[in-house]
A protein has these predicted regions:
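Active-site HxH/HxHxD metal-binding segment of metal-dependent hydrolases
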Residues: 34-117, 198-202
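Conserved Rossmann-like nucleotide-binding pocket used by diverse enzymes
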Residues: 5, 54, 123
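Metallo-beta-lactamase
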Residues: 92-95, 121-126, 131-204
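Active-site neighborhood of phospho(di)ester-bond hydrolases with catalytic His/Asp-centered motifs
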Residues: 29-30, 51-58, 77-80, 126-129, ...
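Conserved beta-strand hairpin/beta-sheet module of binuclear metal-dependent hydrolase folds
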Residues: 1-46, 136-146
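Short Gly/Pro-enriched turn/cap motifs at secondary-structure boundaries
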Residues: 7-9, 105-106, 126-128
């Protein structure tokens, strides 16, 4: 059974998720935000070993803590190549600052790829639209949706990399997943996929 701890961090209350299999000390950190010391202190307090950082996208409020955590733990880092490539342009440096981080090599994830943290396995689902390379991570009955899908809403598309038609396609893909999932978004309260199918005005 997957155990999930939620740390809302910073002025933007970005949800950092620490996910692991019950009775396992190896965990994944999904979107560490930009307050890395809080993440590290939480993990240390629980006796957890951070195996991987999984980034749903490259916006600064989700990635600011990556360098510190990666340096102190030696963990692997996964994100989409599409967001990484766009981060390497000057005009996008504010929104996508991760390219300025000189930490260990980035691993680029792709649709359907399976990434492990201890006994937990996360499957990559490409969901562009909020950014060029936004992804969700599925693990058991959980979806870590980043800024693609929120409770009752969806991610904004007016920043570099945003596109309404693209995010609509991604939302349709999420809604079309079989069965129900708990949805853990980048901001705000968690929800369920079934609830969003019924109540979310952005899901057709």
């Amino acid at each position: 059974m997957l155990k999930i701890d939620i740390l809302p961090l910073g002025d933007y209350q970005t949800n950092c998720y620490i996910a692991r299999e019950e009775n396992s000390q190896s965990c994944a950190v999904i979107d560490p935000g930009y307050m890395p010391e809080q993440v590290l202190q939480f993990a240390e307090g629980k006796g957890l070993c951070i195996d991987v950082i999984l980034l749903t996208h490259g916006h600064f409020d989700h990635v600011g803590g990556v360098k510190t955590i990666a340096e102190k733990t030696g963990c692997a880092l996964w994100m989409s190549q599409a967001d990484w490539s766009q981060e390497n342009t000057q005009e996008n440096a504010f929104f996508y600052p991760i390219a300025n981080c000189d930490f260990a090599p980035v691993n680029f994830c792709e649709e359907g790829q399976r990434i492990t943290a201890g006994d937990a396995t996360f499957t990559v689902m490409e969901t562009p639209g909020h950014t060029w390379g936004s992804v969700c991570y599925l693990c058991e009955d959980a979806i870590f949706s980043g800024d693609t899908l929120f409770a009752g809403s969806c991610g904004r598309v007016d920043l570099p990399g945003g596109d309404w038609n693209t995010i609509q396609t991604s939302l349709d893909r999420l809604a079309g997943l079989p069965g129900d999932y708990k949805v853990y978004p980048g901001h705000g309260e968690y929800t369920t996929l079934e609830r969003e199918r019924k109540m979310n005005p952005y899901i057709r």
